[in-house]
């Protein structure tokens, strides 16, 4: 009888532990896709070592900025063979780079983010691995080979530090999905940002995403494709993909002097290519863009960077903030190395980003309302409405004074609220805007 009771006690204890673990992984819900405010974490701007702990110490600050999803760049061990020290050259998909910490540190970061109302998605590199990945020794057939049987780096790239994976091999596909499941079921992450997703077969993503949603055990997961192929949605099952086209248009308008209305045309084109309800991730920078220049450098000034941010996110979300832009970090960032960022610098810029993100989040008419546009060469002008609240947004895309002479009649001679200052204003038929000035007006 004692032995029987002991076995019963152990069974109950194990069941209780399993229930607790399941509750820890299921007691937090993702924001709706069209409510996502994503913050990209490059661990190498937080600390030279033990970076995950350093990121965890800033979770409250990131949440206070307005983020509800944290995207963490690759945290896995980096290969040593042919290495460029890129975090996208992975030697083991189920371990953490000692430079950043441990799996326990990652679990703690996820738990702290959830406690602060943020989801966590991990960067996932499915297209290629490091040359000394644990798979290479025993599974050479999992890699793409040339006619002589030599493993090759990804065709059409200069990524010589990584080996191209062979998606004709079903065993490799299964191993890849198993590794992704590990981070969902054992660590509790809420999804993935999938690197160069367009280079991986869409039918793989369909299978992987289906299995991940089942493995999540009732939790929703967020899947973001770094790519612009509509197949990401129609075949693969992703929730979001990249607005690379809009980023290119933004540079042409703000930097090269193209018409402001080109942004409207690009927006219509991008959203016209994807299924209704899916979201393009809009950004003024990310880890790739930041290797070339900071937003301050690219858009000519802090004011230019903020104007570009308003044009990008208020026209049509989703929203991405790359960790460092909120404090107007002035230089480019090479994510292959540690780059210290002073998080206490430029508090007035941080306050402005907070205000803009709060306006975006607190007003569904802006984040997901109906869009009416008013094309102009030098001012991006558009209206957002949910038929209860109406907003007129004007963005001077030039580093010079500009007059917008086509104020819609319904916005003329009305009492309007400037959402940034709280002041009441009235508009006539035209308005003059200072260099890179933007106005967010509520009727």
What is each residue range found by the language model?
Residues 4-14:
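Sec-dependent N-terminal signal peptides
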Residues 16-43, 47-71, 77, 302, ...:
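Carbohydrate-interacting/catalytic domains
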Residues 20-53, 57-69, 74-187, 207-217, ...:
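Substrate-binding/active-site clefts of carbohydrate-active enzymes
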Residues 37-39, 70-72, 120-122, 192, ...:
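Hydrophobic faces of well-ordered beta-strands that scaffold small-molecule active sites
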Residues 67, 189, 238, 317-318:
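A structural motif
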Residues 71-83, 123-132, 195-201, 225-230, ...:
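Short, solvent-exposed turn/loop segments enriched in Gly/Ser/Thr/Pro and often Arg
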Residues 85-94, 141, 156-163, 243-250, ...:
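Short glycine/proline- and charge-enriched loop/turn segments
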Residues 185, 195-283, 302, 311, ...:
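Active-site-proximal helices and loops of the catalytic beta/alpha 8
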């Amino acid at each position: 009888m004692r032995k029987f009771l002991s076995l019963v006690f152990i069974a109950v204890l194990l069941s209780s532990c399993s229930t607790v673990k399941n509750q820890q992984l299921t007691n937090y819900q993702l924001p709706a896709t069209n409510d996502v405010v994503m913050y990209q974490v490059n661990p190498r701007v937080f600390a030279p070592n033990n970076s995950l702990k350093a990121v965890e110490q800033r979770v409250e600050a990131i949440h206070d900025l307005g983020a509800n999803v944290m995207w963490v760049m690759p945290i896995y061990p980096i290969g040593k063979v042919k290495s460029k020290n890129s975090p996208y050259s992975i030697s083991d998909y189920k371990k953490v780079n000692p430079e950043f910490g441990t799996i326990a540190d990652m679990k703690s970061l996820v738990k702290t983010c959830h406690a602060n109302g943020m989801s966590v998605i991990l960067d996932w590199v499915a297209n290629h691995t490091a040359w000394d990945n644990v798979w290479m020794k025993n599974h050479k057939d999992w890699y793409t080979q040339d006619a002589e049987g030599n493993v090759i780096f990804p065709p059409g790239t200069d990524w010589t530090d990584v080996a191209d994976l062979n998606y004709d091999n079903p065993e490799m596909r299964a191993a890849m999905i198993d590794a992704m499941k590990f981070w969902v079921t054992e660590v509790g992450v809420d999804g993935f940002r999938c690197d160069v997703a367009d280079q991986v077969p869409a039918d793989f993503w369909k299978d992987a995403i289906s299995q991940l949603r089942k493995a999540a055990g009732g939790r929703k997961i967020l899947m973001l494709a770094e790519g612009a192929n509509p197949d990401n949605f129609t075949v693969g099952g992703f929730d979001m993909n990249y607005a690379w086209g809009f980023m290119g248009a933004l540079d042409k308008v703000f930097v090269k002097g193209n018409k402001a209305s080109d942004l409207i045309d690009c927006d219509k084109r991008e959203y016209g290519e994807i299924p209704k309800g899916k979201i393009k991730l809009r950004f003024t920078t990310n880890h790739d863009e930041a290797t070339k220049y900071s937003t301050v450098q690219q858009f000519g000034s802090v004011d230019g960077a903020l104007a570009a941010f308003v044009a990008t996110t208020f026209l049509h979300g989703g929203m991405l903030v790359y960790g460092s832009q909120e404090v107007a970090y002035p230089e480019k960032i090479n994510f292959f190395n540690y780059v210290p960022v002073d998080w206490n610098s430029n508090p007035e810029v941080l306050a402005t980003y907070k205000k803009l993100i709060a306006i975006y989040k607190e007003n569904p008419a802006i984040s997901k309302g109906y869009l009416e546009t008013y094309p102009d060469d030098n001012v991006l002008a558009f209206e957002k409405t949910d038929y209860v609240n109406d907003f007129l947004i004007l963005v001077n895309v030039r580093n010079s004074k500009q007059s917008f002479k086509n104020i819609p009649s319904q916005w003329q001679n009305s009492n309007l609220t400037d959402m940034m200052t709280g002041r009441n204003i009235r508009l006539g038929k035209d308005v003059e805007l200072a260099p890179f000035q933007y106005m967010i007006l509520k009727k």
